[in-house]
């Protein structure tokens, strides 16, 4: 049984499309945003005698993954749309090949869940469309290496995550429909302790 903490350099790509309804014309607004951020997480895991591992990783917090401004006549002025994600929880497995007693390499796979919350406001800071916060699932794949030092260990890994598409219709304002696709890439460094 092990516990640890990890630092992650996260790159994300978010592609969103908003379709407005209930107006004279139907507008489709599409934007793609990329960005990066630093995240910290905690994890618990169990390592088998052979070296392979199963575990859970949790990030406590919220991060903005996209923001764009467009000019609209309904409502008038600029409209700023944004989306944030919060509290990712990941279950993972690490099939491991130990090259020595203290050093091994592994493939990593798993599933993750997080909450996505989009919204948009106009120039008067009035919410023009509000969307339901929704849990999305994602598939995690990657690879890494681990090194043991007594009861301590260190890991370095690269991960990619592809999430389900977020789809929801606003219950206010223009009753717009939003669709968003989120993909992430992570470089992670972790330290842990074996009990």
Give the positions of each predicted feature:
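Gram-negative outer-membrane beta-barrel domains
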Residues: 1-195
